Amino acid sequence: MKVAVLGAKGRMGAEAVAAINAASDLTLSAALDLGDSLDQLVSSGTEIVVDFTTPDSVMKNLEFAIQNGIHVVVGTTGFDESKLNLLKSMLSKHPKVGALIAPNLA
């Protein structure tokens, strides 16, 4: 399975990159951070994205991933009820895409 990490230079992102690299059944498709293009998720064939970015950027990242059929795992803190409702709305338009919100993975 091809997995990408957003926020790859942060503490949790770096741990996720290391774990993916150590797993025999996962392939790191992209390790992106501030300033990197999300288009790399599509060009690398990413199937799942793990987001350890910031509350300010997570929704844009989720929208991009979901619109491109990429499943998401969110480890970003600050995911409130309004963001959850927006995520549900995005997912309702893309029923084959899944999302897991786990904001305290540290």
Description of each model-found segment:
Residues 42, 48, 52, 56-75:
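Rossmann-fold NAD(P) dinucleotide-binding segment
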Residues 1-4:
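Extreme N-terminal starter segment of soluble prokaryotic enzymes
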Residues 30, 47-48:
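Short, Asp-centered acidic motifs that coordinate Mg2+ and/or phosphate
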Residues 36, 77-80, 105:
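Short, acidic/turn-prone active-site loops that include or flank metal/cofactor-
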Residues 63, 76-100:
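Rossmann-fold NAD(P)-binding glycine/threonine-rich loop
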Residues 28, 72-73, 98-99:
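Hydrophobic beta-strand scaffold residues
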